[in-house]
Amino acid sequence: IREMMDQGRDISEFVPNKAAFHTTPYDKSVFDQLVSYQFRRETPESLKTITDVSEGLEHRFIKVAKTSFGAEELATQVKTKRYTRTRIDRIIVNTLLGITGADTELPPQYARVLAFNKCGTQILKEMGRTSAIPIITKTADAVSAKDDFWRMFKNDLLATDIYALMTDNKQAGQDFKTSPIYVK
């Protein structure tokens, strides 16, 4: 589906109607610029704190970032038999979002509802009564969160804001304007 979206092809037969309607084409070149910028400003010390960066991999990223452009080129040149492409891709996104090893050691702080159907409505009610963590259906309700919850949630918001930069609607705060999708 992502590949089809990259190519501007119709995905409506593969996703619920409302999801297809809310899917915005994106410009991957903006992501490439952000990745190049971020890695060129990193230091070995700062990269070392990012999730999955170990064994001197931070030095490889710093060296390659000086001569490569974009996520694809960076990942291709950093990848080796020892470091899988999946791991490299994760490191790139974690670096862009500033997700550290300490962040990923936290237990889940919330569950965020992106879409639901009629059956899901009942499940959400039950989860609201029994869940040990908050169930977020409205982003504004989570703004007053503190400590570990907020630390995790701000990365969620940042990811959406970065995605928005790649779309026609570049305005930050889209999470506060978009409700979960009800699928009939």
Give residue spans per PLM region.
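Active-site cores that bind ATP or allylic diphosphates and position pyrophosphate for catalysis
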Residues: R2-K184
